[in-house]
Amino acid sequence: MKTLTRNAYAKVNLALDVLRRREDGYHDVCMIMQNLSLYDTLTFTVEEADTLTIALACDKAFVPCDARNLIYKAIALMGETYHLTGHVHVELVKRIPVEAGMAGGSTDCAAAFHATRELYGLDVSDQELMKLGVKLGADVPYCIMAKTALSEGIGEVLTEVAPLPDCFVVVAKPTISVSTKMVYENLHANELQHHPDVAGMVDALKQGDLSGVASRMENVLETVTTKLYPQIEEIKQTMKESGAENAIMSGSGPTVFGLYTEKATAEQAAEKIRQQYGLSEVYVTQPC
């Protein structure tokens, strides 16, 4: 029997631009992706067996633990691709908010790819894992890479960039559910009046210029979500009024995050948001 434990880190989009809708229904995007210190923990156990079987357990009852789960799908895809056998059991401790725009499912999926490779001693590169990962989700290749990156194409074309300078990141998930599909269907990329300065952000990251990064934070999907869910804009404004360098929505939402230079200021802002909006999923994190 072999056992392995991995942490799977949340991500936010420091910038998110949508360039066009493709004929295959996906959208070409241009994003800056950053990992945060908020993470799920996955413990994998493999026992010998003649065929591949997968069992998944989670500490949160609302998380599906069957073939719908991306962890399950990743192990099954690895098994099919590399002809693996054995009974794989996974224990998931879930801390990243679900359906939050923070790649919680994708990062767990990436952890499953990495763990399966290690447990079975497979001579498989990260690039090969990323090619498999994109079959399961556009954010999965980034989560396999797990470094600050410029993300293009549908999210699978990745270029490592300098990480976000030291700061504190307050993350707040409103108690609303946002459909990514609905957001993209209601976005008219060709009619957008403004686009994020992604190239400028890459330069600011290279220079370690936190204020330069913050001033370029922008997410074009907010043009859809803030009209439907005003609380997203309200939380952004509360973060800014509470000392954030800037605050935007991550991914397709509804999570909002803000950058702070001081831990005490970040913690005070987090507590204010918990109290003012009655939210339980509010965290003070750091880039990682």
PLM ranges: what are they?
Residues 2-7, 15-17, 21-31, 122-246, ...:
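ATP-dependent small-molecule kinase catalytic core of the GHMP/sugar-kinase superfamily
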Residues 59-60, 219-222, 255:
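A short, structure-level motif marking secondary-structure boundaries and short turns
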Residues 76, 80, 114, 118, ...:
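Short, well-ordered alpha-helices that flank and scaffold nucleotide-derived cofactor binding pockets
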Residues 42, 71, 90, 112, ...:
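Hydrophobic packing within well-folded, soluble alpha/beta domains
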Residues 63, 101, 223-224, 258:
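A generic structural signal for short
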Residues 91-120, 138, 245-260:
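Glycine/serine-rich anion-binding loops at beta->alpha junctions
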